[in-house]
């Protein structure tokens, strides 16, 4: 089951709560409220999305967590983003069908000037059993409090959580830009995107192994950007993947 995580320290979560007033309280666990978003449980806590570390609570409610959050960037522009969290060298469990379905829905419903992007794996929390997907609105206070923009996010969630998810090839990406350059393959239904290891990570085989084993669906394809993953690490990564009969796509 899905579980939505809303953080009172986050302006997008607060706008979400304003837009969806009918979220009946189910129970209180300490300072954390468990409410209902449609037919799905929603956790409301006082901190920031990246501070939430109650995986035990998530697992008691569902296996697939969706964190509602603001997005920030150095050169702000209106944007919807989706990504799996992870503060390397560890990461959360990625849910490629869910993350990619939400990404497609956001892109489908986004109105100018909003764009959409699939981001590389970054920032906490790190989960071990429950999957974690961040869904974000950016990139300034104006967008975080834009009820129409956050309404698109709500619409995308309601649409995705109420249907079967895609069945494209689960794909991991190694050495990509922070804003993934292979997102079009997800939009057209060819792949379901999982962990994206950014080029600034200085990827090692251990990074790849950690990410590879933390997906809800088996990784079938890995895109490796050659110029951003230097040997001997690149050769080790390719060997590891091919030994597991994973399709390796070398780019760049």
Swiss-Prot record:
Any single biological process term in GO: D-amino acid catabolic process
Entries under InterPro entries matching the protein: Deacylase_DtdA_archaea, DtdA
Cofactor: Zn(2+)
EC number(s) reported in the record: 3.1.1.96
Family according to the record: Belongs to the DtdA deacylase family.
Function, as annotated: D-aminoacyl-tRNA deacylase with broad substrate specificity. By recycling D-aminoacyl-tRNA to D-amino acids and free tRNA molecules, this enzyme counteracts the toxicity associated with the formation of D-aminoacyl-tRNA entities in vivo.
Protein name: D-aminoacyl-tRNA deacylase
Name of the gene encoding the protein in the UniProt record: dtdA
